[in-house]
Amino acid sequence: KIDQKEINQLFEAAHWAPSSGNRQPWRFVYATDGENRKKFNSVLYDSNAMWAPKAPMLILVFAETKNEEGNNIRTGMFDTGAAWMSLALQANRMGLNSRAMGGIDLEAAYEAAGVPKDRFTAICAIAVGYRGTDEDIHPRMVKNNFANDRKELSEIAFKEQFQS
């Protein structure tokens, strides 16, 4: 279980993330137990549903991508990514693990969290909890150390010109 003070610390870190025009377009809707948590768990695709419901907290992440007048907010998803990263860094500092998952039913996420579709875009879910064992995660990830496999820097950073 993650207590409310710890939950508040996570969202406090996210809330200080930089954003274009200080718009702060991120919306985090979380559940820890009860019927709402069951609804949140139901949006997970099978590969995530085998482990994520064991985490003490599940967060559904949305970005404001249209303003009140219906105009696009071009940086909404980028800024929300910065807020999620701030939350992840704070979780790590607190001895918690956080894992974002794109493997969710985005349409179901709106309903589960009660978020309006006209101005917000569903992005992902985040499981937050304590490190489990290899038995708690998908066997493919254990076998391939999938979670920590990274491209070479030369594949992602280029001086002056992109190279394929």
Map each language-model feature to its residues:
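Acidic, surface-exposed loops and disordered segments
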Residues: 1-164
